[in-house]
Amino acid sequence: MNSSDLKNDSYLSIEGVSKKFEQFQAVRYTNLKIRKGEIFCLLGPSGCGKTTLLRMLAGFEQPSEGRIFLDGSELTGIPPFRRPVNMMFQSYAIFPHMTVEQNVAFGLKQDQVAKDKIREKVQEALELVEMPKLAKRKPHQLSGGQRQRVALARILVKQPKLLLLDEPMAALDKKLREQMQLEVVDILEKVEATCVMVTHDQSEAMTMASRIAIMNEGEILQVGTPSEIYELPNCRYTAEFIGTVNLFDGTVIQDEVDHVIIQSPVLKHPIFVDHGITGTEGMSVTVALRPEKISMASKPPKKPHNCATGIVQDIAYFGSHSIYHVELETEKLVYVHLPNPERGASHATWQDKVFLEWNPHSCVVLTH
């Protein structure tokens, strides 16, 4: 890795940061390195510490311990108005008595930028968010998506080194939220913005972020790309928090370099995984298996492992796919995600006996 790569890897550096409110530990000894130009997401449930961490980046809260660096300069202790950081709040915080262009220009006027320069920068920002024709409108004359674009233009117009987005899609309905997720990413990528966003919405994080940090009870449990977080969770909490997952608790009965065999009390056949875990025989583990990794048939497979028999108890129809709730002979409920057949074809239905199987590389072994 060359020196420029090292610099990019630590454009925003959070080093040993903790935050305590009296007896409550909101953020616990956090270390993060965020690259220049990436959209980084703090994802977790309400109360996990993600917003507190974001507020420390903005300067609204000061760390109890630790230091924060941006582009080589320390931010710790610097007040919000002196930081090269802009934040878009969940409510957008647009001034209702101002027009679109006045809202976008507000921060520049506060900084006493020359009028000609303000006019030029506001026009550029409105063109970036595709709203130059709405410059004279008031917020009440705009749709939810348009108000969000105004808020985005207002934080982009000052060209900050770091953008902070607090639950950016929370005020939008589902359809508009899905549309705006991609639009916002496109805008941020055009200006090569470095952005940290906070959300509790898994699909929002998976759609928008280049990397995600999973948070719970003030701690970061895993950092990775959306595919790494989904396909290779490092703990039970992450596996359950992202998407739907089947979990099988079991015991290691054989662990070799190229495979591990696990026996679960809820499965009649052992689970074979095509990689070792450097564990020991008798070790307790959990196997994570995503519903779309399981195939379902009306005839039993001819294999000694990675299979189960059950009865279809429920079917959730989602148009392009259905999720089958299959109760095994041991009363364990397993979720199976299958694409819906073409019109006229058929899948299993309620109370059908079905046979499940999965590949050795589809499982993830969790040791904690």
Language-model-detected regions and their locations in the chain:
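ABC ATPase nucleotide-binding domains
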Residues: 39, 80-86, 90-240
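Non-catalytic connector elements of ABC transporters
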Residues: 245, 255-368
